[in-house]
Structures are given as structure tokens and as C-alpha cells.
Amino acid sequence: QQPVVFYIDTLIQDSWVKAIQKSADEWNIIFEDLGIGKPIIIKPYEKDSTFRANNPMINTIAFLNNNNSEVTAYNVTDLRTGEILSSKIGVPRDLAVSVRRNGVYQMAEIDPRFRTYYIADEVICENLTARMLKAFGLSLGLATNLAGSAAYSPEELRSPEFTQKYGITASVMDNVLYNYLAQPGDKEKGVVLIVDKPGVCDAFTLKYLYAATSENESDTLKKWAMEHDGDPRYFYGKRSPAYATDPRCQNYDLGNDPIASLDAQIAHVKYVVKNSPAWFHDDNIPNDYRELFPDFVIIELINKTLSPVSSYIGGIYINEANEKSNVPSYQPVSADMQKKVLQKIFSTFYDLSWLDSNKDFLRLGGVNPDMSTWIYNNGYPMMSLMFRLMRMGLSVEKSTRPYTQEAYLNDIEKQLFKETLNGKPLSAPMIAQLSVYISSLKGMCPTLKAIDKAVSTRVTSIALNEQTNHKLQSLGLLTTFASISATEKQSGMEPMTSVNFYSGTDIEAICYDKLKSTRRYLIQARSLASNDIERGKCDYLIAMIDRVI
């Protein structure tokens, strides 16, 4: 047994060195429990003239004096054996940029220390400790485990006793930092708000990798693994392929309840929209930060709230096959859960008026239009929903009571025309989403795509003139439609990097039927329009369909 010595750059300030040491100490606690002692040792760069930080045979923690704002880590390995020869970890000069960008949106409502541009060094050190936990884990041979953050319930993650004992994730090798399921007042109760220690899965992995075993090592390791069979805390989640998305293995997710997770994140962003202008009135704050701040809200909404929750639609839980395991290899997300998620996405993302409610917030970015309109006109959330439609095939195939593509589109259609069914004109958000919906349905039908292309090249149509058609622009319709399309087959040669053995389900007939039913609903919606502009919008959407059917 040899110690793992890391040489740390003397340019790193003392408070950060202590934060890094704290991270190493947390890993050493697990090693001590295994009877191995404290193998991770941190020393300053040696002053000896022969010392070289770029020596591939020594472990280093370097100060990165560049524009990067994330902790980086990679291993130098022996390609013949896979042995880790050394680890190279980088601590960025601009770590505060990353803390400020991600922490404010997720934690400002819970932790007042994030309600400012000037993030305190104490907060940065907490973040550095959290990030170094994963970096050290990588150096010890642990792989990214995207399922770690999905192991615990929202109730557990709001419990002071639970979070102080177990942390906020079963594995720090996941891509999660903050306990955004916490609510105002939880910090004062003692709820842990940031990753602060390795999880139970990490502890087990160290035992599996480093603990002494009997002579029959293989049987011992299998026995240890089977002791936790079916326990979500010990599930190792790889990045899943697009055609078989495991919703437990998503970036930025937290907790085992996607609805509660979405509600918590939306509440935090609402708080930021309402209160953030008061945090950034100092003239010394860089203008580029203020100007981009509202745009980060859109990124937060789409990448960190919409994407993880939408993965449950057509999602499938994938477990490693084992002859002794009672856990099925493939278990589709239940139809009820998929329907709940779809309904939640509509109820959440089709009322974004709160995004535009604070004009001071919008003015942070200069002369900003309504942000909700920008989101709708760029195809969200319909783009995400139609993307999931193309990934439902395997889930439907493996389920005994599937949520089929046809049922999914029926539910989307009911939501899109909810106003029409209640005798009301279509709202602007629904008009924008319908254009994406129609374009995506056409894009998933190779025959209709061919017809649409032929019509476009044969006649001077609306599509050819929409870039300069001021009448269309005055109607508030998209001039360049966002859509989801099936991949076109083209001739040619390119390097083959992977082989995909899965062939998607042919849903062309279903999409064609939905276009026809959408047309019928649009005719009904047109009759409910209160003015010529609304009727013009309906006419344009009907024309989109008539081009191909």
C-alpha cells in the first residue's frame, strides 16, 4: 500500500488549500473505515530545482490562470494495464464565475449568501470542496455515476438529520452540486445545501476496489455486490443512449420525484426574477454579467429543468444483467408517470408570464422583449416534447401497458387545443407551439417531407417568402420554424465511430392522422378567433398542413 501524494500549486491561496484538504480528508475517512489509513496526502510544490509539475508520473493540483471556470481532472494511465499512473487536477482562477452563474439561480432563495454578485470566499471554498470530491474520486479510479443524485426522496433531502449523515447524493461522481430541493428556512434547520462528503455508493466502491478480500476474490466481490442488489443508492448509472433514456441518469437532476424537483427549481427561478435586480445595482458590476443574467434564466429553465423531467417520457430504467439479480434488465417508466410529467410540463411552461412580470429584471439585459415570447418562438417546450416522441419506441416495446406514441400525441393535442375545446381563441403561446408541432409532425414523415420539399421548389409559396413577408411577422408567427425531423439519408462516406443496433419505430401513419385532426381543430379555432390577426394565424397554420396532405 502506497500513499497517493498530490503536490499542490503554491499559487493557490491558503483558504482554497484548506478547502482542498477538507475534500481529501473526507475520502480518507472512508479509507480509515476500511483499515487502510489515510492514503491521500497533499504537499506543496517542492522547491527543489529538479521538481517538474508537468511530470506525468506525479499527481498535481495546479492553479489555472486562464478563462476556464471549472475544476478539471484527468488521469494519466498505462494503456497496457489500465493502471492510473498519475492524476492532474486544475483549480481555476475564475472559480467564482462558475459559482456565481450556477449558485445564484439554484440557491439564492434558500441561502442569502448567493444574493449578490460578490460571492464570499467562504461560499467559494464550500464549492471547491464539493468539486474536489469528484476530482479526487476520479483519481482513485471511480467513474462518473449519473444515478447518484436520483437515489434519495425530496423528504430525505429536506431532513437535517438525513443530509448531515448521508449528504445530498449517493455518489459525488454525479454532476450535482446543490441541494435545490431545500426550501426557505431549511438552511437554518441544518439541512445540508451542497455536496460535502462522499456518498454511500462511493464508500462501497472504495471497498470494492481497495479492501482486502479472501483468496477467492471474484466470489467475494460478487457477494458484496449482491448484498445491495435493487438498492437505488448503489445503482451505477451510465450515460444512456438517446433511444433508451434512463431518467435516473440525467445531468442536473436531484431526487427520485421529477415533479417535486421541477416545482422546486421553478420556485427558485421565480424568486430570482422577482428579487435579483436589487442584488446587481452596484456600478462596479461588469455590464456583460448584468446583460447576460436574464439569458441565463432561459438556460436554467431549458437545460436544468425541462430536459431532465422530459426524459421520463419514453424513459426506460436500464439495469445491468445479472443471473442472480431480481431486478429486470429493462423496466419502462410507467404510463401514469409519463402522463403526469407531460401534464406538468404543460401546466408549468405554458404560463411563463412571471418571467415578464418584473420589468427591472428584463432591463438588466438592456432592451429585452418579453422573455416568455422568446422561449415560445424558439420552439420550447414543444421541441423537447417532440424529441421525446422519437425516443419512445423501446419503452413501448418493453412495456406490458405502454404509453404509446399515438396516446402521447393525443394528449399533446388535447393540451394544445385546450382553449379551443373550452370555446376560447388560441393564445399566442399555443400558436407558437402549434407551428413547431406541425413542422415536427411533417419532419417525422419522409413522404410528407418529400412532398413539402417538392412544393417549395415548384411554386412561389408562403415558405419561400416567409423571411421577408412582413405580414407574417406582424402576425407574430415564427419566420424560421423550429422542428424535430427524422434524419435524412444521404450518400457518401464518413468514419464509423459506433454501430447503432436499434431501429426506430415507424410512426408516419400516426403523424399523418394527427396532422389531419390538427387541421380540424384549427378550423374550429379559426371560428373562435376574435379578430383578423388571430384568423390569419390559424389560416397560416392550416396552410402549412395543406401543403402536404
Regions found by a protein language model. Give the residues of each.
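Acidic, metal/ion-coordinating pockets
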Residues: 146
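Metzincin-family zinc-dependent endopeptidase catalytic domain
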Residues: 1, 14-139, 143, 167-168, ...
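Conserved catalytic/binding loops enriched for acidic/polar residues
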Residues: 149-549
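Short, well-ordered beta-strand elements
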Residues: 4-9
